[in-house]
């Protein structure tokens, strides 16, 4: 244990972890699951080390004070029941105490079910990255853990590092952030011959680094090490922080900007051209570069349960289009995509646009946090940043550039502007998080939610409930540690009972197009502070509607039990109980929503530096450029004027491509779509559209593609399974057929296609 904790604090921490995950004697315990306490896995050791090395000093002092408080109440000597009562009493004493206890609870559960262990002879030593590491709790959950050792491969992008304490570079444009927006702009400008420098706060990883271990992934790929709670304790924020940004960890649902949103942005915010064919071409180009398609979007058990339930209720569904390379697709690895894709099938920004930028001369630096934007005479002059790597090397980095793109993501972009003191009164003011929740269905047969492609069947029945707002329902891919941490803890015994049900659980999640908004500010040290409250009446109505809808779909799909999480307890409905499901839903609808009463998750943060035509309510003008500082551009999800009600990756990229053209004009370049390498076509839908006059020139290519697909079916039996699934999916898809993209299972009349955004009219 770290020397930063006293002996008494170490003892209290060990007992605290064992209170959350206790040793319980039962008559039948063949795997030792019930008898195994958290400390037997070394959880208290890891948590204590994290407290000292990872938690900022002000928070750390508060967490350690809680340990002292527990010691003063006789926590070490108390029985399990007494300790549980002490924890509940402390949590109810103040919001600060509740937040501290929640930290210990969530971290203990995450580590107990997520940590791998070294093999014998020293089973108490825990490592984050042991390639062959296993966790003894995984056996009862049916979780395989890591299934393959990654192949050693060199990184395709060679990043630059400072050679001394100070480093200065000259560039035409400095891009802060390497995610969906920053990567697209970097490629567009570098491929036109401009000098591009990209700064990324996180590190670079590739498939060689991905060992399919969730704790390692959260700490290295995710923003602030995993689910980050807002400052007011209401929303868990999920975001990427690595080279490639959120595209490295997302679940790949590629949805085009809905027509409804595009029209609204033009009418209310003045974003000229967003409703035009030119914007369609922006989306077409990024989809082509990402190999977006539905070839590998088949249904695992969770997705089948949603589709079955929706069909029985006559709810509209759609099949996801995802950015997989079909030639590399492996369903055994697909469920680990949120932990970093080992197979190389996932077409992330790192593997596509950033690689294009690098091959055209862009310089990319990781471990580099932008402190402020340099401004001279009202114009951008560059970026001042701090380099700090895991080896302890630090340096001051200055990029001199007349154009600066802020693309740090909606959680960090406003913080950079606030640290610089630019952007106007709306900076950080309109944080949309597309708030979401989850309902768990327990089925008779095992569901194995970590196997196969996540998020392939979606319920689109309520994307627009009449006023342009509603909710979208889909399927996640959770690993055991995350499951354990999001299931509320009421007692050690109850939580273990619920965890034994995990193999049989299918999880339905949803997110809203939110009307209400939160805010991003900075603290005294300049760090981003996020607040959000689900206080808007429309948002509350839609959140409750989504909860009820998920329960009805589970019931229709055959779930024997439905579990709904409040922040401090789990509420259950069973099929054989006297209370009807509708009565249960009515009872749940009276539960509070505000102040963290129900767990809310956000994977999509937007609008904190939004574009628009009103200087009081927007940060950038309608082209993406700041009004008060020329040459500073917004190039990420924070530029969106409103919430989308759809997964935002394609929209972020299309808007970034639009903004990139404006920057190219400023630099004296041309407006042109990126010259992407020709993709490998695997379906008629993906074939390039050619003029009728050239139809005979297509025949040799058509024959080549037909042979390639048939050869793939012969040499890889899994491709045959995928093809069969595609055929069955097409036969069973209900609802409308989109005239633009041909996808079936679409929303009802008057709505829009959730695949390509086209307006749907019967």
Language-model features and meaning:
Residues 165-179, 197:
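Beta1/beta-strand and adjacent pyrophosphate-binding region of the FAD-binding site
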Residues 2-116:
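Acidic/polar surface patches and capping/hinge elements
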Residues 757-762:
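Short Cys/His-rich micro-motifs in 6-15 aa windows
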Residues 56-57, 216-295, 507, 511, ...:
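Redox-cofactor-proximal catalytic regions of oxidoreductases
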Residues 184, 188-214, 236, 242, ...:
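Glycine-rich loop(s) and the adjacent beta-strand/alpha-helix scaffold that form part
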Residues 110-112, 119-156, 160-161, 272-372, ...:
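Conserved redox-cofactor binding core of oxidoreductases
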Residues 250, 424-554, 561, 571, ...:
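FAD cofactor-binding and catalytic pocket of flavoenzymes
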Residues 739-740, 755:
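Short, cysteine/histidine-rich loop/knuckle motifs that typically chelate Zn2+
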């Amino acid at each position: 244990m770290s020397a930063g904790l006293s002996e008494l604090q170490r003892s209290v921490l060990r007992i605290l972890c064992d209170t959350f995950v206790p040793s319980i004697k039962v008559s039948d315990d063949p795997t030792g699951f019930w008898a195994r306490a958290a400390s037997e896995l070394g959880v208290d050791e890891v948590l204590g080390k994290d407290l000292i090395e990872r938690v900022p000093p002000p928070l750390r002092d508060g967490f350690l004070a809680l340990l002292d408080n527990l010691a003063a109440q006789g926590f070490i000597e108390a029985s399990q029941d007494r300790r549980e009562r002490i924890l509940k009493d402390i949590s109810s004493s103040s919001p600060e105490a509740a937040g501290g206890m929640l930290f210990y609870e969530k971290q203990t559960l995450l580590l107990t079910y997520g940590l791998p262990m070294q093999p014998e002879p020293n089973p108490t030593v825990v490592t984050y990255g042991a390639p062959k590491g296993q966790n003894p709790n995984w056996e009862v959950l049916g979780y395989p853990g890591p299934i393959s050792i990654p192949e050693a491969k060199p990184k395709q992008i060679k990043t630059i590092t400072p050679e001394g304490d100070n480093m200065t570079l000259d560039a035409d444009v400095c891009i802060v952030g390497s995610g969906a927006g920053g990567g697209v702009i970097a490629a567009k400008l570098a491929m036109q011959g401009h000098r591009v420098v990209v700064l990324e706060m996180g590190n670079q990883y590739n498939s060689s680094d991905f060992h399919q271990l969730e704790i390692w992934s959260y700490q290295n790929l995710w923003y602030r090490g995993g689910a980050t709670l807002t400052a007011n304790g209401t929303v868990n924020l999920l975001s990427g922080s690595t080279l490639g940004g959120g595209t490295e960890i997302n679940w790949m649902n590629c949805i085009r900007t809905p027509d409804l949103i595009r029209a609204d942005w033009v009418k209310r915010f003045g974003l000229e051209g967003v409703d035009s064919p030119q914007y369609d071409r922006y989306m077409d180009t990024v989809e082509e570069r990402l190999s977006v398609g539905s070839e590998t979007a088949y249904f695992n058990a969770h997705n089948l349960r949603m589709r079955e339930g929706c069909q029985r209720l006559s709810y509209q569904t759609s099949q996801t289009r995802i950015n997989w390379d079909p030639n590399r697709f492996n369903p055994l690895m697909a469920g680990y995509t949120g932990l970093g894709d080992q197979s190389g099938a996932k077409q992330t920004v790192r593997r596509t646009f950033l690689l294009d930028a690098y091959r055209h001369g862009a310089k990319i630096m990781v471990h580099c946090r932008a402190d402020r934007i340099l401004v001279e005479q009202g114009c951008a002059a560059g970026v001042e940043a701090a380099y700090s790597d895991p080896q302890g090397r630090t340096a001051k980095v200055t990029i001199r550039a007349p154009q600066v793109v802020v693309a740090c993501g909606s959680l960090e972009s406003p913080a950079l502007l606030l640290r610089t003191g630019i952007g106007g009164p709306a900076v950080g003011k309109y944080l949309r998080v597309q708030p979401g929740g989850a309902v768990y269905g327990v089925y008779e047969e095992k569901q194995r939610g970590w196997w196969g492609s996540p998020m392939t069947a979606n319920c689109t029945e309520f994307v627009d409930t009449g006023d342009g707002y509603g909710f979208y329902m889909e399927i996640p891919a959770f690993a055991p540690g995350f499951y354990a941490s999001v299931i509320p803890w009421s007692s050690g015994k109850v939580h273990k009972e619920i965890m034994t049900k995990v193999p049989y659980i299918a999880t339905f999640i949803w997110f809203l197009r939110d009307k209400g908004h939160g805010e991003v500010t900075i603290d005294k040290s300049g760090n981003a502070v996020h607040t959000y409250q689900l206080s808007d009446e429309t948002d509350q109505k839609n959140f409750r509607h989504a909860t009820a809808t998920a329960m009805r779909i589970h019931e229709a799909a055959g779930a024997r039990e439905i579990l709904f999480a409040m922040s401090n307890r789990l509420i259950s409905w069973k099929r054989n109980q006297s209370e009807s499901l509708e009565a249960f839903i009515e009872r749940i609808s009276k539960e509070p929503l505000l102040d963290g009463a129900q767990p809310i998750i956000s994977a999509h943060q937007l609008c904190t530096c939004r574009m628009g035509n009103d200087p009081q309510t927007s940060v950038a003008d309608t082209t993406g450029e700041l009004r008060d500082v020329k040459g500073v551009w917004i190039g990420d999800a924070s530029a969106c004027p409103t919430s989308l009600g759809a997964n935002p990756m394609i929209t972020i990229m299309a808007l970034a491509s639009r903004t990139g053209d404006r920057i190219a004009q400023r630099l004296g370049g041309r407006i042109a779509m990126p010259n992407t390498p020709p993709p490998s076509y695997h379906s008629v839908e993906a074939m390039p559209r050619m003029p009728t006059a050239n139809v005979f020139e297509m025949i040799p290519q058509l024959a080549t593609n037909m042979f390639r697909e048939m050869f793939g079916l012969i040499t890889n039996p899994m491709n045959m399974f995928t093809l069969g699934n595609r055929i069955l999916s097409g036969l069973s898809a209900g609802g409308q057929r989109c005239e633009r993209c041909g996808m079936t299972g679409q929303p009802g009349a008057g709505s829009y296609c959730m695949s390509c955004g086209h307006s749907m009219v019967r």
